[in-house]
Protein backbone atom coordinates (compact mmCIF):
# COMPACT_ATOMS: atom_id res chain seq x y z
CA UNK A 1 0.00 0.00 0.00
CA UNK A 2 1.49 3.30 -1.11
CA UNK A 3 0.37 6.44 0.68
CA UNK A 4 -1.06 9.35 -1.25
CA UNK A 5 0.41 12.84 -0.84
CA UNK A 6 0.15 13.71 2.86
CA UNK A 7 -2.83 16.01 3.28
CA UNK A 8 -1.56 17.35 6.59
CA UNK A 9 1.80 18.45 5.20
CA UNK A 10 0.09 20.27 2.32
CA UNK A 11 -2.35 21.92 4.72
CA UNK A 12 0.38 22.97 7.14
CA UNK A 13 2.32 24.68 4.33
CA UNK A 14 -0.82 26.57 3.33
CA UNK A 15 -1.40 27.77 6.90
CA UNK A 16 2.06 29.34 6.96
CA UNK A 17 2.17 30.77 3.45
CA UNK A 18 -1.34 32.14 2.79
CA UNK A 19 -3.40 35.00 4.16
CA UNK A 20 -6.95 34.17 5.24
CA UNK A 21 -10.19 36.02 5.74
CA UNK A 22 -11.14 33.80 8.70
CA UNK A 23 -9.13 31.70 11.11
CA UNK A 24 -11.57 29.41 12.91
CA UNK A 25 -10.33 27.95 16.20
CA UNK A 26 -12.08 24.70 17.09
CA UNK A 27 -12.73 21.68 14.89
CA UNK A 28 -15.99 20.47 16.37
CA UNK A 29 -19.47 20.79 14.89
CA UNK A 30 -19.63 24.57 15.16
CA UNK A 31 -16.17 25.25 13.78
CA UNK A 32 -16.53 22.75 10.93
CA UNK A 33 -19.89 24.21 9.90
CA UNK A 34 -18.50 27.76 10.00
CA UNK A 35 -15.55 26.74 7.82
CA UNK A 36 -17.88 25.11 5.31
CA UNK A 37 -20.32 28.02 5.18
CA UNK A 38 -17.59 30.64 4.82
CA UNK A 39 -15.59 28.70 2.22
CA UNK A 40 -18.62 28.03 0.05
CA UNK A 41 -19.33 31.78 0.04
CA UNK A 42 -15.87 32.47 -1.36
CA UNK A 43 -13.99 33.49 1.79
CA UNK A 44 -10.47 32.23 2.38
CA UNK A 45 -10.74 30.04 5.48
CA UNK A 46 -8.34 28.28 7.82
CA UNK A 47 -9.41 26.06 10.72
CA UNK A 48 -7.20 24.77 13.51
CA UNK A 49 -8.08 22.13 16.12
CA UNK A 50 -5.77 21.36 19.05
CA UNK A 51 -6.79 17.67 19.11
CA UNK A 52 -8.64 15.60 16.55
CA UNK A 53 -11.66 16.93 14.72
CA UNK A 54 -14.81 16.33 16.82
CA UNK A 55 -12.67 14.93 19.62
CA UNK A 56 -14.60 16.63 22.41
CA UNK A 57 -18.33 17.43 22.67
CA UNK A 58 -19.14 16.74 19.03
CA UNK A 59 -18.37 13.02 19.26
CA UNK A 60 -19.86 12.52 22.74
CA UNK A 61 -23.50 13.27 21.95
CA UNK A 62 -26.53 10.99 21.89
CA UNK A 63 -25.94 10.84 18.11
CA UNK A 64 -29.32 12.29 17.28
CA UNK A 65 -30.53 14.84 14.75
CA UNK A 66 -33.73 15.94 16.42
CA UNK A 67 -35.99 18.85 17.16
CA UNK A 68 -35.84 18.35 20.91
CA UNK A 69 -39.32 17.27 21.95
CA UNK A 70 -38.60 17.90 25.62
CA UNK A 71 -37.65 21.54 24.98
CA UNK A 72 -41.34 22.26 24.36
CA UNK A 73 -42.07 22.01 28.09
CA UNK A 74 -39.68 24.94 28.64
CA UNK A 75 -41.34 27.03 25.94
CA UNK A 76 -38.36 26.91 23.57
CA UNK A 77 -40.60 26.90 20.50
CA UNK A 78 -38.18 28.86 18.33
CA UNK A 79 -35.37 26.40 19.08
CA UNK A 80 -37.57 23.40 18.29
CA UNK A 81 -38.78 25.03 15.07
CA UNK A 82 -35.21 25.79 13.97
CA UNK A 83 -34.02 22.30 14.94
CA UNK A 84 -36.80 20.56 13.02
CA UNK A 85 -36.11 22.69 9.95
CA UNK A 86 -32.44 21.72 10.12
CA UNK A 87 -33.33 18.06 10.65
CA UNK A 88 -35.48 18.10 7.53
CA UNK A 89 -32.72 19.88 5.62
CA UNK A 90 -30.19 17.20 6.59
CA UNK A 91 -32.58 14.49 5.45
CA UNK A 92 -32.15 15.97 1.97
CA UNK A 93 -28.49 17.02 2.01
CA UNK A 94 -27.03 14.10 3.99
CA UNK A 95 -29.48 11.16 3.89
CA UNK A 96 -26.70 8.67 4.67
CA UNK A 97 -25.91 10.52 7.93
CA UNK A 98 -29.44 11.52 8.93
CA UNK A 99 -31.33 8.25 9.25
CA UNK A 100 -34.99 8.25 10.36
CA UNK A 101 -35.65 6.28 13.54
CA UNK A 102 -38.96 5.46 15.19
CA UNK A 103 -39.21 6.63 18.80
CA UNK A 104 -41.68 5.28 21.35
CA UNK A 105 -42.63 7.60 24.21
CA UNK A 106 -44.77 5.63 26.72
CA UNK A 107 -47.14 7.24 29.20
CA UNK A 108 -47.77 5.81 32.68
CA UNK A 109 -50.47 6.37 35.25
CA UNK A 110 -49.54 9.02 37.79
CA UNK A 111 -46.36 10.04 36.00
CA UNK A 112 -45.39 12.96 33.78
CA UNK A 113 -46.35 13.36 31.00
CA UNK A 114 -49.97 12.30 30.94
CA UNK A 115 -51.29 10.69 27.73
CA UNK A 116 -53.17 13.88 26.85
CA UNK A 117 -50.17 16.14 27.44
CA UNK A 118 -47.93 13.74 25.52
CA UNK A 119 -50.34 13.69 22.58
CA UNK A 120 -50.50 17.49 22.57
CA UNK A 121 -46.72 17.77 22.70
CA UNK A 122 -46.12 15.31 19.89
CA UNK A 123 -48.87 16.92 17.83
CA UNK A 124 -47.22 20.32 18.28
CA UNK A 125 -43.90 18.72 17.35
CA UNK A 126 -45.44 17.54 14.06
CA UNK A 127 -46.88 21.00 13.46
CA UNK A 128 -43.55 22.73 14.04
CA UNK A 129 -42.03 20.31 11.54
CA UNK A 130 -44.72 21.50 9.11
CA UNK A 131 -45.97 17.91 8.89
CA UNK A 132 -43.08 17.07 6.60
CA UNK A 133 -41.55 13.58 6.32
CA UNK A 134 -40.16 11.23 7.63
CA UNK A 135 -43.65 10.36 8.95
CA UNK A 136 -46.23 11.82 11.27
CA UNK A 137 -46.71 10.56 14.80
CA UNK A 138 -49.42 8.18 15.96
CA UNK A 139 -50.85 6.92 19.22
CA UNK A 140 -50.38 3.29 20.27
CA UNK A 141 -52.33 1.42 22.90
CA UNK A 142 -50.49 -0.58 25.55
CA UNK A 143 -51.04 -3.90 23.79
CA UNK A 144 -49.41 -2.65 20.60
CA UNK A 145 -46.53 -1.17 22.58
CA UNK A 146 -45.98 -4.53 24.27
CA UNK A 147 -45.98 -6.24 20.89
CA UNK A 148 -43.40 -3.81 19.49
CA UNK A 149 -41.11 -3.70 22.57
CA UNK A 150 -41.98 -6.66 24.82
CA UNK A 151 -39.44 -5.84 27.55
CA UNK A 152 -40.77 -2.33 28.16
CA UNK A 153 -42.47 -1.90 31.56
CA UNK A 154 -46.16 -2.71 31.20
CA UNK A 155 -47.37 -1.99 34.76
CA UNK A 156 -49.35 1.23 34.70
CA UNK A 157 -48.76 1.85 31.00
CA UNK A 158 -51.52 3.90 29.36
CA UNK A 159 -50.17 3.65 25.83
CA UNK A 160 -47.49 5.52 23.93
CA UNK A 161 -46.88 8.04 21.20
CA UNK A 162 -44.74 6.99 18.26
CA UNK A 163 -42.85 9.72 16.43
CA UNK A 164 -39.81 9.92 14.20
CA UNK A 165 -36.49 11.70 14.64
CA UNK A 166 -33.10 10.82 13.20
CA UNK A 167 -29.85 9.15 14.22
CA UNK A 168 -26.42 10.15 12.98
CA UNK A 169 -22.72 9.48 13.33
CA UNK A 170 -21.84 12.76 15.03
CA UNK A 171 -18.08 12.65 14.42
CA UNK A 172 -18.58 11.77 10.75
CA UNK A 173 -21.08 14.59 10.30
CA UNK A 174 -18.38 16.98 11.46
CA UNK A 175 -15.83 15.30 9.21
CA UNK A 176 -18.01 15.61 6.11
CA UNK A 177 -18.49 19.32 6.77
CA UNK A 178 -14.71 19.68 6.80
CA UNK A 179 -14.29 17.57 3.68
CA UNK A 180 -16.81 19.73 1.86
CA UNK A 181 -15.08 22.90 3.05
CA UNK A 182 -11.86 21.49 1.62
CA UNK A 183 -13.37 21.04 -1.83
CA UNK A 184 -13.88 24.80 -2.08
CA UNK A 185 -10.51 25.88 -0.78
CA UNK A 186 -10.65 25.83 3.02
CA UNK A 187 -7.69 24.40 4.90
CA UNK A 188 -8.19 22.54 8.18
CA UNK A 189 -5.47 21.02 10.34
CA UNK A 190 -5.80 19.02 13.53
CA UNK A 191 -3.28 19.03 16.39
CA UNK A 192 -2.61 22.75 15.95
CA UNK A 193 -3.23 24.90 19.02
CA UNK A 194 -3.91 28.63 18.72
CA UNK A 195 -3.13 31.08 21.52
CA UNK A 196 -5.81 33.66 22.42
CA UNK A 197 -3.28 36.51 22.31
CA UNK A 198 -2.32 37.85 18.90
CA UNK A 199 -0.83 40.93 17.25
CA UNK A 200 -2.01 43.18 14.45
CA UNK A 201 -0.21 43.65 11.15
CA UNK A 202 -2.04 46.09 8.92
CA UNK A 203 -5.48 44.66 8.18
CA UNK A 204 -4.49 41.23 9.48
CA UNK A 205 -4.33 39.56 12.87
CA UNK A 206 -1.29 37.36 13.39
CA UNK A 207 -2.08 34.33 15.55
CA UNK A 208 0.54 32.20 17.27
CA UNK A 209 0.16 28.50 16.49
CA UNK A 210 1.78 25.44 18.00
CA UNK A 211 1.91 22.25 15.96
CA UNK A 212 1.38 19.57 18.60
CA UNK A 213 2.29 16.86 16.07
CA UNK A 214 5.61 18.33 14.95
CA UNK A 215 6.44 20.26 18.11
CA UNK A 216 7.19 23.60 16.44
CA UNK A 217 5.56 27.02 16.38
CA UNK A 218 4.50 29.26 13.51
CA UNK A 219 2.22 32.18 12.66
CA UNK A 220 -1.09 32.38 10.80
CA UNK A 221 -2.35 35.62 9.24
CA UNK A 222 -6.10 36.23 9.09
CA UNK A 223 -8.39 39.25 8.90
CA UNK A 224 -10.74 37.86 11.56
CA UNK A 225 -10.30 35.28 14.31
CA UNK A 226 -13.29 33.12 15.27
CA UNK A 227 -13.51 31.35 18.64
CA UNK A 228 -15.57 28.18 18.09
CA UNK A 229 -14.14 26.18 20.97
CA UNK A 230 -17.50 25.01 22.31
CA UNK A 231 -17.53 24.33 26.07
CA UNK A 232 -14.04 25.83 26.33
CA UNK A 233 -15.15 29.21 25.00
CA UNK A 234 -14.97 30.92 28.39
CA UNK A 235 -11.50 29.62 29.28
CA UNK A 236 -10.23 30.52 25.80
CA UNK A 237 -11.69 34.03 25.70
CA UNK A 238 -10.80 34.91 29.28
CA UNK A 239 -13.84 37.19 29.51
CA UNK A 240 -16.84 37.04 31.85
CA UNK A 241 -18.31 33.51 31.82
CA UNK A 242 -21.25 33.06 29.48
CA UNK A 243 -21.67 29.28 29.68
CA UNK A 244 -23.14 26.81 32.12
CA UNK A 245 -21.31 23.68 30.95
CA UNK A 246 -22.80 20.35 31.94
CA UNK A 247 -21.45 16.81 31.70
CA UNK A 248 -23.39 14.18 29.79
CA UNK A 249 -22.58 10.48 30.20
CA UNK A 250 -23.73 7.56 28.04
CA UNK A 251 -23.42 3.79 28.45
CA UNK A 252 -23.11 1.19 25.71
CA UNK A 253 -24.48 -2.31 26.35
CA UNK A 254 -25.13 -5.32 24.16
CA UNK A 255 -28.39 -5.16 22.23
CA UNK A 256 -29.33 -8.64 23.44
CA UNK A 257 -29.19 -7.41 27.04
CA UNK A 258 -31.47 -4.46 26.31
CA UNK A 259 -33.48 -5.24 23.18
CA UNK A 260 -35.70 -2.54 21.71
CA UNK A 261 -36.26 -4.34 18.39
CA UNK A 262 -34.91 -1.45 16.37
CA UNK A 263 -36.88 1.34 18.04
CA UNK A 264 -35.59 4.14 20.20
CA UNK A 265 -37.44 4.51 23.50
CA UNK A 266 -37.91 7.63 25.62
CA UNK A 267 -37.73 6.87 29.35
CA UNK A 268 -37.75 8.85 32.59
CA UNK A 269 -35.50 8.34 35.58
CA UNK A 270 -37.44 7.02 38.59
CA UNK A 271 -35.09 9.05 40.77
CA UNK A 272 -35.53 12.59 39.42
CA UNK A 273 -37.83 12.28 36.40
CA UNK A 274 -35.16 13.31 33.90
CA UNK A 275 -35.84 12.30 30.30
CA UNK A 276 -33.35 9.85 28.76
CA UNK A 277 -33.07 7.79 25.59
CA UNK A 278 -32.51 4.09 24.98
CA UNK A 279 -31.08 4.00 21.47
CA UNK A 280 -30.33 0.95 19.30
CA UNK A 281 -27.15 1.25 17.23
CA UNK A 282 -26.50 -1.91 15.27
CA UNK A 283 -26.08 -4.78 17.71
CA UNK A 284 -25.53 -2.40 20.64
CA UNK A 285 -27.76 -0.15 22.72
CA UNK A 286 -26.84 3.31 24.00
CA UNK A 287 -28.36 4.58 27.26
CA UNK A 288 -28.17 8.27 28.05
CA UNK A 289 -27.69 10.86 28.98
CA UNK A 290 -26.97 12.27 32.41
CA UNK A 291 -26.73 16.02 32.98
CA UNK A 292 -24.63 17.31 35.84
CA UNK A 293 -23.02 20.71 36.31
CA UNK A 294 -19.36 20.94 35.46
CA UNK A 295 -17.31 20.42 38.64
CA UNK A 296 -14.09 22.32 38.00
CA UNK A 297 -11.38 20.31 39.80
CA UNK A 298 -10.49 22.24 42.94
CA UNK A 299 -12.41 25.28 41.71
CA UNK A 300 -16.11 24.77 40.89
CA UNK A 301 -16.27 28.24 39.31
CA UNK A 302 -13.40 27.61 36.89
CA UNK A 303 -14.44 27.12 33.26
CA UNK A 304 -13.44 23.75 31.77
CA UNK A 305 -10.28 23.42 29.71
CA UNK A 306 -9.47 20.95 26.90
CA UNK A 307 -6.94 19.15 29.06
CA UNK A 308 -9.50 18.39 31.78
CA UNK A 309 -10.52 14.74 32.09
CA UNK A 310 -14.19 14.31 31.24
CA UNK A 311 -15.32 10.79 32.16
CA UNK A 312 -18.08 8.70 33.63
CA UNK A 313 -18.18 8.09 37.37
CA UNK A 314 -19.75 5.19 39.23
CA UNK A 315 -22.69 7.40 40.25
CA UNK A 316 -23.40 8.08 36.56
CA UNK A 317 -23.33 4.41 35.65
CA UNK A 318 -25.59 3.48 38.57
CA UNK A 319 -28.06 6.22 37.63
CA UNK A 320 -28.29 5.11 34.00
CA UNK A 321 -28.56 1.41 34.85
CA UNK A 322 -31.26 2.16 37.41
CA UNK A 323 -33.23 4.10 34.79
CA UNK A 324 -32.87 1.39 32.15
CA UNK A 325 -33.84 -1.38 34.56
CA UNK A 326 -36.88 0.55 35.74
CA UNK A 327 -38.05 1.01 32.14
CA UNK A 328 -37.11 -2.54 31.06
CA UNK A 329 -37.53 -4.80 34.14
CA UNK A 330 -36.53 -8.09 32.42
CA UNK A 331 -33.15 -6.61 31.47
CA UNK A 332 -31.79 -6.52 35.03
CA UNK A 333 -28.62 -4.83 33.77
CA UNK A 334 -25.56 -5.03 35.99
CA UNK A 335 -22.31 -3.03 35.88
CA UNK A 336 -20.62 -6.01 34.21
CA UNK A 337 -22.96 -5.54 31.23
CA UNK A 338 -21.49 -2.13 30.40
CA UNK A 339 -19.28 -2.44 27.32
CA UNK A 340 -18.03 1.13 27.54
CA UNK A 341 -18.92 4.64 28.61
CA UNK A 342 -18.44 7.98 26.92
CA UNK A 343 -18.80 11.46 28.35
CA UNK A 344 -18.73 15.01 27.05
CA UNK A 345 -19.41 18.60 27.97
CA UNK A 346 -22.44 20.51 26.73
CA UNK A 347 -21.81 24.22 26.06
CA UNK A 348 -25.12 25.46 27.48
CA UNK A 349 -25.70 29.20 27.67
CA UNK A 350 -26.10 30.54 31.21
CA UNK A 351 -29.42 32.39 31.13
CA UNK A 352 -29.89 32.27 34.89
CA UNK A 353 -32.31 29.34 34.72
CA UNK A 354 -32.93 27.52 37.98
CA UNK A 355 -32.35 24.01 36.64
CA UNK A 356 -29.92 22.36 34.27
CA UNK A 357 -32.79 20.95 32.22
CA UNK A 358 -34.07 24.47 31.61
CA UNK A 359 -30.65 25.85 30.63
CA UNK A 360 -30.66 27.27 27.14
CA UNK A 361 -29.67 25.15 24.13
CA UNK A 362 -29.68 28.33 22.07
CA UNK A 363 -26.47 30.05 21.03
CA UNK A 364 -24.86 33.47 21.30
CA UNK A 365 -22.52 35.37 18.97
CA UNK A 366 -20.47 38.36 20.10
CA UNK A 367 -17.24 40.18 19.28
CA UNK A 368 -14.71 41.89 21.51
CA UNK A 369 -12.22 44.72 21.26
CA UNK A 370 -9.28 42.34 20.87
CA UNK A 371 -10.44 41.26 17.43
CA UNK A 372 -12.12 37.94 18.21
CA UNK A 373 -15.58 36.86 17.08
CA UNK A 374 -17.00 34.36 19.59
CA UNK A 375 -19.78 31.81 19.26
CA UNK A 376 -21.03 29.53 22.02
CA UNK A 377 -23.96 27.28 22.82
CA UNK A 378 -26.15 25.55 20.28
CA UNK A 379 -26.58 21.88 19.50
CA UNK A 380 -25.44 19.38 16.89
CA UNK A 381 -28.69 19.58 14.93
CA UNK A 382 -28.47 23.35 14.42
CA UNK A 383 -24.77 23.51 13.54
CA UNK A 384 -25.46 24.66 9.97
CA UNK A 385 -27.92 27.45 10.79
CA UNK A 386 -25.72 28.65 13.64
CA UNK A 387 -22.74 28.77 11.27
CA UNK A 388 -24.77 30.79 8.76
CA UNK A 389 -25.40 33.43 11.44
CA UNK A 390 -21.74 33.51 12.44
CA UNK A 391 -20.57 33.99 8.86
CA UNK A 392 -23.16 36.71 8.28
CA UNK A 393 -21.72 38.55 11.28
CA UNK A 394 -18.15 37.86 10.15
CA UNK A 395 -18.86 39.42 6.75
CA UNK A 396 -20.21 42.54 8.46
CA UNK A 397 -17.01 42.83 10.50
CA UNK A 398 -14.83 42.24 7.44
CA UNK A 399 -16.67 45.02 5.62
CA UNK A 400 -16.14 47.35 8.59
CA UNK A 401 -12.44 46.55 8.38
CA UNK A 402 -12.32 47.41 4.70
CA UNK A 403 -12.33 43.92 3.22
CA UNK A 404 -13.16 44.10 -0.50
CA UNK A 405 -13.89 41.29 -2.90
CA UNK A 406 -16.31 38.60 -3.87
CA UNK A 407 -18.59 36.96 -1.32
CA UNK A 408 -21.64 34.90 -2.19
CA UNK A 409 -24.82 34.46 -0.14
CA UNK A 410 -25.15 31.36 2.02
CA UNK A 411 -24.73 28.19 -0.05
CA UNK A 412 -25.21 25.47 2.57
CA UNK A 413 -29.00 25.41 2.88
CA UNK A 414 -29.35 23.00 -0.02
CA UNK A 415 -25.76 21.91 -0.69
CA UNK A 416 -25.24 18.14 -0.29
CA UNK A 417 -22.47 16.85 1.92
CA UNK A 418 -19.79 14.73 0.19
CA UNK A 419 -21.47 11.39 0.86
CA UNK A 420 -24.69 12.58 -0.74
CA UNK A 421 -23.53 14.74 -3.60
CA UNK A 422 -22.54 12.21 -6.25
CA UNK A 423 -24.45 10.25 -8.86
CA UNK A 424 -25.26 6.63 -8.07
CA UNK A 425 -25.17 4.61 -11.29
CA UNK A 426 -25.40 0.88 -11.76
CA UNK A 427 -24.68 0.30 -8.07
CA UNK A 428 -21.37 2.17 -8.25
CA UNK A 429 -20.79 4.77 -5.56
CA UNK A 430 -18.10 7.35 -6.08
CA UNK A 431 -16.27 9.63 -3.71
CA UNK A 432 -13.64 12.22 -3.03
CA UNK A 433 -9.91 12.19 -2.45
CA UNK A 434 -8.43 14.06 0.53
CA UNK A 435 -9.15 17.80 0.62
CA UNK A 436 -7.03 20.82 1.54
CA UNK A 437 -5.01 21.02 -1.66
CA UNK A 438 -4.41 24.31 -3.49
CA UNK A 439 -7.51 26.51 -3.26
CA UNK A 440 -9.69 26.77 -6.36
CA UNK A 441 -9.87 29.97 -8.36
CA UNK A 442 -12.90 31.90 -7.09
CA UNK A 443 -15.64 33.16 -9.37
CA UNK A 444 -16.10 36.91 -8.65
CA UNK A 445 -19.46 38.15 -7.53
CA UNK A 446 -20.51 41.41 -5.97
CA UNK A 447 -20.73 41.62 -2.22
CA UNK A 448 -24.40 41.86 -1.14
CA UNK A 449 -25.46 45.14 0.45
CA UNK A 450 -24.80 45.44 4.17
CA UNK A 451 -27.45 43.72 6.27
CA UNK A 452 -28.48 41.21 3.62
CA UNK A 453 -27.31 37.71 2.91
CA UNK A 454 -28.71 37.30 -0.58
CA UNK A 455 -31.58 35.14 -1.77
CA UNK A 456 -32.04 31.73 -0.23
CA UNK A 457 -31.72 28.81 -2.64
CA UNK A 458 -34.93 26.99 -3.48
CA UNK A 459 -35.44 23.72 -1.59
CA UNK A 460 -34.20 20.77 -3.62
CA UNK A 461 -36.33 17.97 -4.95
CA UNK A 462 -36.35 15.03 -2.47
CA UNK A 463 -34.11 13.07 -4.86
CA UNK A 464 -31.69 15.95 -5.34
CA UNK A 465 -29.16 14.27 -3.07
CA UNK A 466 -28.67 11.63 -5.77
CA UNK A 467 -28.00 14.18 -8.50
CA UNK A 468 -24.51 15.39 -9.49
CA UNK A 469 -25.24 18.77 -7.93
CA UNK A 470 -21.61 19.61 -7.25
CA UNK A 471 -20.96 20.08 -10.95
CA UNK A 472 -23.12 23.18 -10.74
CA UNK A 473 -20.98 24.71 -8.03
CA UNK A 474 -19.23 27.94 -9.08
CA UNK A 475 -15.97 26.63 -7.65
CA UNK A 476 -14.48 23.31 -8.83
CA UNK A 477 -13.55 21.01 -5.94
CA UNK A 478 -9.90 20.89 -4.97
CA UNK A 479 -7.99 17.60 -5.14
CA UNK A 480 -10.88 15.60 -6.56
CA UNK A 481 -9.99 12.63 -8.73
CA UNK A 482 -11.50 12.75 -12.18
CA UNK A 483 -14.63 14.57 -13.27
CA UNK A 484 -17.62 14.55 -10.98
CA UNK A 485 -19.92 13.53 -13.82
CA UNK A 486 -17.99 10.34 -14.50
CA UNK A 487 -17.07 7.41 -12.26
CA UNK A 488 -14.02 7.92 -10.08
CA UNK A 489 -11.02 5.79 -11.03
CA UNK A 490 -11.13 2.36 -9.42
CA UNK A 491 -14.63 2.90 -8.05
CA UNK A 492 -15.96 -0.52 -7.13
CA UNK A 493 -19.53 -1.76 -7.21
CA UNK A 494 -21.10 -3.07 -4.03
CA UNK A 495 -22.48 -5.92 -6.11
CA UNK A 496 -19.03 -6.93 -7.33
CA UNK A 497 -17.86 -7.91 -3.83
CA UNK A 498 -19.25 -10.71 -1.70
CA UNK A 499 -20.08 -8.70 1.42
CA UNK A 500 -22.42 -9.65 4.24
CA UNK A 501 -25.66 -7.63 4.42
CA UNK A 502 -24.68 -5.90 7.66
CA UNK A 503 -21.38 -4.80 6.13
CA UNK A 504 -23.09 -3.48 3.01
CA UNK A 505 -25.58 -1.53 5.13
CA UNK A 506 -22.83 -0.15 7.35
CA UNK A 507 -20.65 0.99 4.45
CA UNK A 508 -23.45 2.76 2.60
CA UNK A 509 -24.80 4.42 5.74
CA UNK A 510 -21.34 5.53 6.84
CA UNK A 511 -19.70 6.66 3.60
CA UNK A 512 -22.65 7.19 1.28
CA UNK A 513 -21.41 8.09 -2.16
CA UNK A 514 -17.78 7.85 -1.01
CA UNK A 515 -18.01 4.12 -0.37
CA UNK A 516 -16.46 3.30 -3.75
CA UNK A 517 -13.06 4.35 -2.43
CA UNK A 518 -13.35 1.97 0.51
CA UNK A 519 -14.46 -0.87 -1.75
CA UNK A 520 -11.55 -0.17 -4.09
CA UNK A 521 -9.17 -0.92 -1.23
CA UNK A 522 -10.91 -4.24 -0.64
CA UNK A 523 -10.77 -5.08 -4.35
CA UNK A 524 -7.06 -4.28 -4.53
CA UNK A 525 -6.04 -6.24 -1.42
CA UNK A 526 -8.25 -9.09 -0.24
CA UNK A 527 -6.98 -8.99 3.35
CA UNK A 528 -8.57 -5.55 3.75
CA UNK A 529 -12.01 -7.14 3.37
CA UNK A 530 -11.83 -8.94 6.71
CA UNK A 531 -13.93 -7.97 9.73
CA UNK A 532 -12.14 -6.23 12.56
CA UNK A 533 -14.59 -7.62 15.14
CA UNK A 534 -16.82 -10.70 14.79
CA UNK A 535 -19.87 -8.81 16.13
CA UNK A 536 -19.44 -5.62 14.14
CA UNK A 537 -19.45 -4.70 10.42
CA UNK A 538 -16.17 -2.76 10.36
CA UNK A 539 -13.57 -3.75 7.73
CA UNK A 540 -9.79 -3.51 7.77
CA UNK A 541 -10.01 -1.31 4.67
CA UNK A 542 -11.66 1.35 6.80
CA UNK A 543 -8.49 1.74 8.84
CA UNK A 544 -6.54 2.59 5.70
CA UNK A 545 -9.26 4.89 4.42
CA UNK A 546 -9.42 6.72 7.76
CA UNK A 547 -5.72 7.54 7.54
CA UNK A 548 -5.53 8.37 3.84
CA UNK A 549 -8.83 10.11 3.21
CA UNK A 550 -10.61 10.84 6.50
CA UNK A 551 -8.01 13.05 8.18
CA UNK A 552 -7.02 10.69 11.03
CA UNK A 553 -3.60 11.35 12.56
CA UNK A 554 -3.52 9.15 15.68
CA UNK A 555 -4.60 5.67 16.71
CA UNK A 556 -7.37 7.20 18.82
CA UNK A 557 -8.61 9.25 15.86
CA UNK A 558 -9.02 6.04 13.85
CA UNK A 559 -10.48 3.69 16.46
CA UNK A 560 -12.71 6.09 18.36
CA UNK A 561 -14.08 8.51 15.75
CA UNK A 562 -13.54 7.02 12.25
CA UNK A 563 -13.99 3.29 12.91
CA UNK A 564 -15.50 3.40 16.43
CA UNK A 565 -14.38 0.08 17.83
CA UNK A 566 -13.57 1.93 21.05
CA UNK A 567 -17.29 2.53 21.58
CA UNK A 568 -18.90 -0.65 20.31
CA UNK A 569 -16.37 -3.51 20.50
CA UNK A 570 -16.04 -5.63 23.62
CA UNK A 571 -12.26 -5.41 23.14
CA UNK A 572 -12.48 -1.63 22.58
CA UNK A 573 -10.30 -2.02 19.50
CA UNK A 574 -7.25 -2.93 21.56
CA UNK A 575 -6.74 -6.07 19.48
CA UNK A 576 -6.31 -3.99 16.31
CA UNK A 577 -4.57 -1.00 17.89
CA UNK A 578 -1.12 -2.37 17.06
CA UNK A 579 -2.13 -2.89 13.43
CA UNK A 580 -3.53 0.64 13.30
CA UNK A 581 -0.35 2.11 14.77
CA UNK A 582 1.72 0.24 12.20
CA UNK A 583 -0.44 1.60 9.37
CA UNK A 584 -0.07 5.13 10.68
CA UNK A 585 3.68 4.71 11.01
CA UNK A 586 3.94 3.48 7.43
CA UNK A 587 1.64 6.11 5.95
CA UNK A 588 3.05 9.04 7.93
CA UNK A 589 6.70 8.02 8.18
CA UNK A 590 6.77 7.75 11.96
CA UNK A 591 9.69 6.66 14.07
CA UNK A 592 9.25 3.71 16.42
CA UNK A 593 9.08 6.13 19.34
CA UNK A 594 6.30 8.12 17.68
CA UNK A 595 4.37 4.94 16.86
CA UNK A 596 4.62 3.72 20.45
CA UNK A 597 3.48 7.11 21.75
CA UNK A 598 0.28 7.06 19.69
CA UNK A 599 -0.43 3.49 20.77
CA UNK A 600 0.12 4.36 24.44
CA UNK A 601 -2.22 7.35 24.19
CA UNK A 602 -4.98 5.16 22.80
CA UNK A 603 -4.60 2.54 25.51
CA UNK A 604 -4.78 5.30 28.12
CA UNK A 605 -7.98 6.66 26.56
CA UNK A 606 -9.59 3.22 26.65
CA UNK A 607 -8.53 2.81 30.25
CA UNK A 608 -10.07 6.19 31.15
CA UNK A 609 -13.47 5.10 29.81
CA UNK A 610 -13.48 2.30 32.39
CA UNK A 611 -12.17 4.25 35.38
CA UNK A 612 -15.68 4.39 36.86
CA UNK A 613 -15.19 0.77 37.94
CA UNK A 614 -12.57 1.89 40.47
CA UNK A 615 -14.67 4.69 42.01
Where are these regions (language model features)?
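Core beta-strand elements of the Rossmann-like FAD/NAD(P) dinucleotide-binding domain
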Residues: 18-20, 214-224
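Dinucleotide-binding Rossmann-like beta1-alpha1 core, especially the glycine-rich loop
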Residues: 63-148, 276
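A conserved short coil-to-beta-strand element within the FAD-binding core of flavoproteins
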Residues: 190-205
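C-terminal accessory subdomains/tails of enzymes that are appended
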Residues: 10, 19, 51, 97, ...
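Extreme N-terminal leader/targeting segments of oxidoreductases
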Residues: 1-22, 37-41
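Glycine-rich FAD pyrophosphate-binding loop
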Residues: 39-59
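Flavin (primarily FAD) binding-site architecture
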Residues: 227-240
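Glycine-rich Rossmann-fold phosphate-binding loop(s) that bind the pyrophosphate
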Residues: 27-28, 50
